[in-house]
Regions:
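Glycine- and acidic-residue-biased ligand/ion/polar-headgroup-sensing regions
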Residues: 48-75, 93, 166, 178-224, ...
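Catalytic core of Fe(II)/2-oxoglutarate
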Residues: 215-227, 234-263
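N-terminal non-catalytic cap/leader segment that marks the start of a structured domain
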Residues: 2-78, 276, 283
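Conserved metal-binding segment of the jelly-roll/cupin
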Residues: 84-104, 114, 221-242
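Short, structured patches in soluble enzyme cores that scaffold and shape functional sites
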Residues: 95, 103-105, 111-115, 148-149, ...
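A short secondary-structure junction signal
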Residues: 120-126, 156-160, 168-177, 202-206, ...
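Double-stranded beta-helix
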Residues: 107-148, 205, 243, 248-283
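A short glycine-rich, His/Asp/Glu-containing loop-to-beta-strand
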Residues: 11-44, 51, 140-190
Length: 283
């Protein structure tokens, strides 16, 4: 069995790959981080035959992009100190572009990639362009920011962020997106976690449906900077009391369709209760 959680990955200056099809069950997604510790530090990269999404976790930078037909500069982007300080700034990059990141302070950036034939231009998704949703109810209520969704004509990638208040659940009721049906499409997923304060933790259970040919049921200890690979199965998350939990989520598959998932039938009844609970708690 291949590894599904990656922790204590040393962050080097420049790009550090964390998960990819080479070291996991993933078929499409590669995820890593760019770290530039000092102002004026630079990193140069290229997308090749993949599309990419750059997520500024914290710090400020400029990003220069060169395609076959144009040059684009996104100057002084990223305003939050860390992921808990506001909405994200993300940049979508199509295949076959070169890009350069120039730090204007210490900066940390998530890099999500997947094979693509997209002809979309590069796109800057600013904090004010992000779709914000309050999802769930009671102790499974959380905030979800969708940055790379229908607003961007990517071929495969869907990218956003989720924030769990202390003690709260997310990806709940448990859902999955691992088979083709009228309501579900197969999408693999990667979660990258941050915890506030950083000595805190959360837990994630990943478990398959009864009809899965290779069933598994695992629980992972989520600590700051942990990365979890979700090849299939239900995958709920909970934050420990006293600690905020954040995760970047990255989805990719043959068909790109956000929200095409199915709930665990044992727990799906909770979704029907959410409007009632939210109405009661409003008073």
């Amino acid at each position: 069995m291949m590894k599904r959680i990656f922790k204590n990955v040393k962050l080097e200056k420049g790009y550090t790959c964390i998960v990819s099809p080479k070291n996991s069950e993933l078929k499409y997604i590669e995820f890593g981080r760019v770290f530039l510790p000092e102002k004026n530090d630079e990193y140069a990269g290229e997308t090749g035959n993949r599309e990419a999404v750059l997520t500024i976790f914290g710090g400020k930078c400029s990003i220069q992009v060169e395609t076959a037909t144009q040059k684009v500069s996104y100057n002084s982007i990223g305003y939050r100190r860390d992921v808990f300080s506001g909405r994200p700034t993300m940049v979508y990059l199509p295949p076959n572009v070169e890009y350069r990141i120039i730090a204007e302070s210490q900066v940390e950036i998530g890099v999500s990639m997947a094979p693509s034939n997209s002809s979309s231009p590069p796109i800057l998704v600013k904090p004010e362009d992000v779709m914000e949703s309050q999802v769930g109810a009671w102790n499974w209520k959380r905030t979800v920011y969708t940055s790379i969704g229908e607003n961007v004509k990517a071929q495969r990638l869907l990218v956003g962020e989720t924030f769990n208040p202390p003690g709260n659940w997310s990806s709940y009721p448990p859902h999955k997106h691992d088979r083709k049906s009228p309501s579900e499409v197969p999408l693999e997923e990667v979660y990258f976690f941050k915890v506030k304060p950083p000595n805190g933790f959360g837990l994630q259970r990943i478990y398959t449906s009864p009809e899965d040919e290779e069933p598994f049921d695992e629980i992972f200890l989520l600590e700051n900077d942990a990365t979890v690979v979700i090849p299939r199965g239900y995958h709920p998350v909970v934050a420990a009391p006293g600690y905020q939990l954040y995760y970047l989520w990255v989805l990719a598959g043959e068909e790109r369709k956000y929200g095409a998932w199915s709930d665990d039938p044992n727990h799906g009844w909770l979704r029907n209760c959410e409007p009632i609970i939210n109405e009661v708690l409003r008073f």
